[in-house]
Amino acid sequence: TFPNTPETVGSAREALKKALADDGTDIVIENSAEYRIDDLFARELEAERLMTLPNNYILIENPFVREPGNLDSVIFDLQVRGLRPILVHPERYSYYYKHPERYEVLHNAGAMFQINVLSLAGGYGKDERKIAEMLIEKGLVDFVGTDLHNAAHADIIDRYLASSDYLK
């Protein structure tokens, strides 16, 4: 679990802004957070301390081991609060592979999906790529993003974007 609070993310944003200014780079830096559905998330939700994207989009993620038992109610509660949940990298949750109908249930319940371009590029494996492509074919993908953590990820994305796989 990452402590994605306004304080921790805000201080990181300020440090980045300072480094960019010191380098002479003039760009606007805003912040949000990706929230794993866990106890910290529940506390931040109740305290109304969640950082959202424009238009009240909120990035949520499941643990990789198993779906949270309260996922359906979290999706509902977020919408009741006027938030628009985006479930990030759903293609990486292997517990859905044997139950792909669960993707449609979640999407129909109001969870938008953001797949990871690294999955499409094969950066996480064949299963993740296959599921990402299936989600696209079924019209369940609302956004494409990335968990770009290092230069190797950038290289994988560059190769993918230059490939015939991307062009189809």
Where does each model-flagged region fall?
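Glycine-rich, Lys/Arg-enriched anion-binding loops that position phosphate/diphosphate groups
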Residues: 111, 127-128
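Short, ordered loop/turn segments at secondary-structure junctions
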Residues: 90-92, 118, 148-149
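Extended substrate/RNA-proximal surfaces in nucleic-acid metabolism proteins
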Residues: 3-113
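Alpha-helix termination/capping residues and helix-transition junctions
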Residues: 129, 137-138
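Short acidic/histidine-rich active-site segments
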Residues: 138-156
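Mid-to-C-terminal alpha-helical segments outside catalytic/metal-binding sites
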Residues: 158-168
